[in-house]
């Protein structure tokens, strides 16, 4: 009887050769590229006169540097315009599909590939972006790579990799009202630490994972990297197949039925052996907020910033540094901390279900005075779907700005930035110093619903308090 994990199965299927030193040459089934990490890679190919080995397995989009208020060309930022023009030229020269601005398919790379059906179970997926682990939600093995590796994949459609150990993260129970996948992964990272996953792939499993939507699973896998893991994944199941069916690049007809049968066989076997296992109880998890300068410095919204002496000795120096940087006092409640900017979007939480969760909180309310709040859909498809359901109107009426798709304030590569000592409530994935623009800017990570609650109240707020006062509505058009 087979006794392998999904990771073992996908690894073995893509192994090209065993290399000296213990690494493996691994075939890459899907290579996703964007405007930031691809120019140098293409330049290296041109210098050596090399073609792109498998242009049909390479798909490009533009996301990091695009402005979200107006995407009229040429961009005001000449460097951003040059980067996009270079990507357009490289894709045209090498025969690579580009999901460009206005194509109906543009967006954040980790949003568009799943929604187009490009990401499928059993694949190996590589991209020059840290959060490529997102695609593991489909039962793929997906990993971020550097620019030199982007070059290698373009040239050979393969990579030299070391096999990872596998840690299964089993989650029992069900998440409570107002608690989302973002809260679950922040809780996991808080509990295990930001370095616990080094050398591991994380398999997310258990009753709480089984009932998550694909978009929630993507949030979970997206932030596995923040816990130190190289990749995270969920075994493919009926939820996966229902999401993929009918998507542009998904198989059809008899090929679909064959694909589903094969995909089903990839799930980790009941007697699979894991290198490590940890368990969590979903019912015990509350809405989370980061208070510090790493994603591991998170607490439940009804908790307080930890006192220094309550921490392990190795955690104390960075906790002291974080409190100084964030202007927070050890022992103070996180709920009630004032915010300046509220950002809903990113490859972590810029999908339709994320926007719906935030809109449910915003509907019938208004952004607090002095708060800048804006919503950036993760893709053109997400934007159009949200607009069809009236979400843009809900947000605008509540005082939020409704923007064009892009990475936006997740990182400081476009005009959406914090200024000075501003503090943001953000649905993105990293709260490092200066991550969102200003070298002195501060970031509080939380779910989209929690960001919406902060925007309405002007401070960190337990979203469950607003949910209890929300009248259910079947339509955002009402």
From Swiss-Prot:
SUPFAM superfamilies: Aconitase iron-sulfur domain. Pfam families: Aconitase. Gene3D superfamilies: Aconitase, domain 3. [4Fe-4S] cluster binds at residues 347, 407, 410. The keyword Iron applies. Keywords: 4Fe-4S, Amino-acid biosynthesis, Branched-chain amino acid biosynthesis, Iron, Iron-sulfur, Leucine biosynthesis, Lyase, Metal-binding. GO terms for molecular function: 3-isopropylmalate dehydratase activity; 4 iron, 4 sulfur cluster binding; metal ion binding. Binds 1 [4Fe-4S] cluster per subunit. This is 3-isopropylmalate dehydratase large subunit.
């Amino acid at each position: 009887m087979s006794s392998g994990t999904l990771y073992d199965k996908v690894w073995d299927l893509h192994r090209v050769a065993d290399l000296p030193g213990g690494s493996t040459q691994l075939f890459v089934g899907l290579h996703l590229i964007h405007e930031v990490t691809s120019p140098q890679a293409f330049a290296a190919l041109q210098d050596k006169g090399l073609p792109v080995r498998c242009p049909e397995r390479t798909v490009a989009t533009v996301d990091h540097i695009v402005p979200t208020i107006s995407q009229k060309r040429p961009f005001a930022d000449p460097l951003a315009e040059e980067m996009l023009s270079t990507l357009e030229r490289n894709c045209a020269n090498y025969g690579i599909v580009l999901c460009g601005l206005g194509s109906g398919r543009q967006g954040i790379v980790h949003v568009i590939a799943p929604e187009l059906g490009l990401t499928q179970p059993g694949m190996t997926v590589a991209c020059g972006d840290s959060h490529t682990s997102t695609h593991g939600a489909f039962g793929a093995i997906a990993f971020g790579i550097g620019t030199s590796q982007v070059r290698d994949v373009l040239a050979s459609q393969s990579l030299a990799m070391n096999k990872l150990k596998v840690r299964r993260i089993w989650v029992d129970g069900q998440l409570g009202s107002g608690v989302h996948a973002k809260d679950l992964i922040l809780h996991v990272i808080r509990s295990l630490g930001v370095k616990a996953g080094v050398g591991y792939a994380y398999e997310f499993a258990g009753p709480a994972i089984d009932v998550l939507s694909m978009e929630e699973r993507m949030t979970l896998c997206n932030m596995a990297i923040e816990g130190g893991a190289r990749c995270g994944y969920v075994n493919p199941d009926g939820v996966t197949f229902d999401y993929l069916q009918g998507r542009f690049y998904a198989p059809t007809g008899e090929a679909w039925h064959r694909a589903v049968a094969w995909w089903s066989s990839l799930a980790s076997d009941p007697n699979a052996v894991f290198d490590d296992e940890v368990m969590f109880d979903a019912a015990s998890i509350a809405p989370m907020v980061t208070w510090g300068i790493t994603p591991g410095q998170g607490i439940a919204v009804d908790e307080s910033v930890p006192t220094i002496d309550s921490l392990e000795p190795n955690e104390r120096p960075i906790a002291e540094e974080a409190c100084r940087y964030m202007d927070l006092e050890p022992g103070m409640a996180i709920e009630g901390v004032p915010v300046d900017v509220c950002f809903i979007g990113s490859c972590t939480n810029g999908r339709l279900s994320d926007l719906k969760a935030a809109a449910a909180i915003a509907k019938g309310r208004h952004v607090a005075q002095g708060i800048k709040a804006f919503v950036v859909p993760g893709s053109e498809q997400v934007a159009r779907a949200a607009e069809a359901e009236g979400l843009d109107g809900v947000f605008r009426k509540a005082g939020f700005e409704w923007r064009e798709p892009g990475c936006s304030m997740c990182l400081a590569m476009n005009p959406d930035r914090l200024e000075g000592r501003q503090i943001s409530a953000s649905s993105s994935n990293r709260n490092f110093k200066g991550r969102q623009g200003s070298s002195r800017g501060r970031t509080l990570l939380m779910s989209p619903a929690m960001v919406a609650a902060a925007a309405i109240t002007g401070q960190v707020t337990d979203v469950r308090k607003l949910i209890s006062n929300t009248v259910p509505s079947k339509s955002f058009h009402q």
